[in-house]
């Protein structure tokens, strides 16, 4: 299958446009910009973001539960979206789901505070477990072995 140079250029424009749409949603949407912040200046197809108010690994796990597989980052704790053509077609849905997940996580934080457990309750999801343990290790060289073991376990049938 060939799309030619014009098809390639069109795909690139679509991907960069969708990435920009995600970035602007995080920056401009009042439901997101109080809790999320974009890391750096996304120029092409990857948008990374973090939060000072919510556990980003819980956000990643909640997005995963909605069918999105965003990539967790460790230092700083963050998430990134690698925009591809399939994402372009559903970018508006991704943003709607991200808003919903942020609202759900904010509500969980409110409940934790009301219950006297304090803000930023313990992260409980898969991403939180992996990155929380890796981030707490004083010797970072063991992280490669940890990640390898995690992936082996995750993908064994």
Residue locations for each model-derived region?
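Conserved small-domain helix->loop->beta segment predominantly found in fold-type I
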Residues: 3, 7-82
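Non-catalytic terminal extensions of PLP-dependent enzymes
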Residues: 49-157
């Amino acid at each position: 299958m060939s799309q030619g140079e014009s098809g390639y250029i069109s795909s690139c424009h679509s991907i960069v446009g969708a990435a920009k749409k995600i970035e602007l949603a995080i920056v401009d949407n009042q439901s997101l910009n109080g809790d999320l912040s974009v890391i750096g200046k996304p120029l092409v197809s990857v948008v990374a973001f973090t939060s000072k108010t919510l556990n980003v690994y819980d956000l990643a796990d909640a997005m995963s539960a909605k069918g999105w597989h965003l990539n967790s980052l460790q230092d700083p704790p963050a998430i990134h979206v690698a925009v591809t053509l399939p994402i372009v077609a559903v970018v508006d849905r991704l943003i709607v789901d991200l808003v919903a997940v942020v609202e759900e996580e904010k509500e969980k934080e409110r409940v934790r505070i009301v219950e006297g457990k304090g803000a930023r309750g313990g992260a409980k999801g898969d991403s939180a477990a992996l990155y929380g343990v890796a981030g707490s290790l004083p010797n970072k060289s063991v992280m490669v072995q940890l990640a390898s073991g995690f992936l082996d376990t995750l993908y064994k049938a």
